[in-house]
Amino acid sequence: MGKIISLANELLALLFNGEYVIQPFIINESEFRIPCLGSGYLNDDISSMSSSQIGMISMILSFSLLYNSSTKYNIIKLDEIDGPLDYNNRVYFADVLNRIMSIMGTEQCIMISHNSELQLDNADIILLKHDANNPDYNRGNIIWSY
């Protein structure tokens, strides 16, 4: 469990500049909690944090579990992973995703999203609903649109 928490905190530092630190999990017969230190305050469980913070921390914990599994993955698929994130965290997450993938040793990421705010300048984009007048949909390398 220590390796997972350690990597999760390393990845969280990329996203939140060290503002949040996951503490050892509380696991017993009657409870499962993930305490998190944030802004000098100890949250007894991440469930008491904002939905955007929960989304980011849950995603980071998932990456940490994946990294510490016995199977290594060159390609990951992220389906609506940015859904619970607010605008600022969504934009920031897209910026940090390449660094997370580098740490994990992942070469490619297939990301499914309904949000146009992502900074995808370095991505190949497949659009299923293209609005030529919307500048948010005209960034990156559009390789196919409908």
What are these regions (language model features)?
Residues V91-Y146:
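C-terminal lobe/lid and adjacent interdomain/linker elements of RecA-like ASCE P-loop ATPase modules
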Residues P24, C36-G40, S51, L61, ...:
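Flexible glycine-/small-residue-rich
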Residues L15, M49-S51, L66-T71, R99-G105, ...:
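Conserved catalytic network of the ASCE P-loop NTPase/AAA+ motor domain
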Residues N17-L37, K77:
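Long, charged, glycine-rich C-terminal linkers/tails
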Residues Y41-D45:
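Interfacial catalytic loop of ABC nucleotide-binding domains
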Residues Y73-I81, L85-N89:
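Walker B catalytic motif
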Residues M1-P24:
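Charged, surface-exposed helical/loop "interaction arms" that form contiguous linear patches used
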